[in-house]
């Protein structure tokens, strides 16, 4: 079974130098930017709406990414939109949400329908960001339900850049190419 599968007339679209582990599943209306990495056990399902993942983002082991359909309660449904240089930690659930550039979603976190994580947003491990919530720029949210804990330091913001760059180098090792970084 191939990890990349069409759904109806939609086939996942892949940018350059993308790494997709053979033990994951990517279905339907999914677009991966250049240098994206998708690690073992991840499921990205773009069946009833679309998923977009920006350049240099990494989706770590066991993550589930899905979308919501249009309904009488939500006319358009919600896609899942992930910006550039985003780190999605192991075992995360992203459902019909928006993650802007240079964010980190901690291991085991859950971000639900219509929620938005602004640039440099950091969702701590195990946190649950409820439907429609907005994590502001450079904010750390923790807990279940997730709440604002504090603003990130400059050093923590630097670590978000580092995390994305590290995963580009790592996926290049898996692909057997030089990243030039």
Which residues make up each language-model segment?
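Glycine-rich hexapeptide-repeat left-handed beta-helix
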Residues: 1-13, 41, 47-80, 90-91, ...
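Thr-Gly-centered strand-to-loop micro-motif
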Residues: 21, 46-47
């Amino acid at each position: 079974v191939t990890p990349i599968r069409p759904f109806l007339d939609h086939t996942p679209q892949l940018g350059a130098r993308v790494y997709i582990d053979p033990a994951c599943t990517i279905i339907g209306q999914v677009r991966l930017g250049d240098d994206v990495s998708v690690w073992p056990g991840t499921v990205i399902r773009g069946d009833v709406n679309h998923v977009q993942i920006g350049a240099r983002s990494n989706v770590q082991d066991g993550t589930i990414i899905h979308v919501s359909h249009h309904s009488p309660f939500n006319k358009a449904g919600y896609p899942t939109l992930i910006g550039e240089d985003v780190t999605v930690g192991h075992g995360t659930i992203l459902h019909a949400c928006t993650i802007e550039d240079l964010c980190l979603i901690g291991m085991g976190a859950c971000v639900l329908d219509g929620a938005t994580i602004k640039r440099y947003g950091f969702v701590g491990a195990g946190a649950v960001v409820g439907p429609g919530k907005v994590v502001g720029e450079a904010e750390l949210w923790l807990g279940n339900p997730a709440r604002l804990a504090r603003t990130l330091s400059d050093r923590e913001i630097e670590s978000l850049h580092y995390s994305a760059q590290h995963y580009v180098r790592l996926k290049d090792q898996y692909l057997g190419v030089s990243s030039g970084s």
